[in-house]
Amino acid sequence: MRDEPPAAPEWSVAAAVEGREISFPNGFVGCTDWKRFMLQSPPEHAPIRVLQSLDNPELALFVLDPFLLSPDYAIDMPEAERRLVQLDKAEDAVLLVLLVIRRDPLLVTANLVGPVVINSRSGLGCQLVLEDTDYSVRHLVYSEHPGQGDKEDAA
């Protein structure tokens, strides 16, 4: 059983947006009022990062590089969202997934169906909702069988 978090890469493109204000013009699914965030990497939580709301200091979203969970993770970003975040080159994209933190660390899940995309150049971001996917909204982060989550929750 994996009882340690996935190892963090030595460098990530996410470092390019860390500490900068990131604007989410449409907010997040279920959380559209807060649009300004800052990505932080508290060392005690590595490789988990925090998207801290600048509009509501009580709101912090825990995020993780999806490739730590699923090395072959792939998404198709619709053109409307590419325009929204002014993303012209794939290499400028920072891809993260939201985590649901639970009291029992073995029950922490990642939403692979609703990834967050940030343009490292423009500082604009959006949350996607993937359709027709086998990914889960409750992908177990710590699991005996990596890659398994609650498949019935997949969109």
Which residue stretches match the model-derived regions?
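Extended catalytic/binding region for NAD+/ADP-ribose chemistry, centered on the ART fold
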Residues: D72-M77
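Short active-site loop/helix that positions an aromatic residue
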Residues: E79-K89
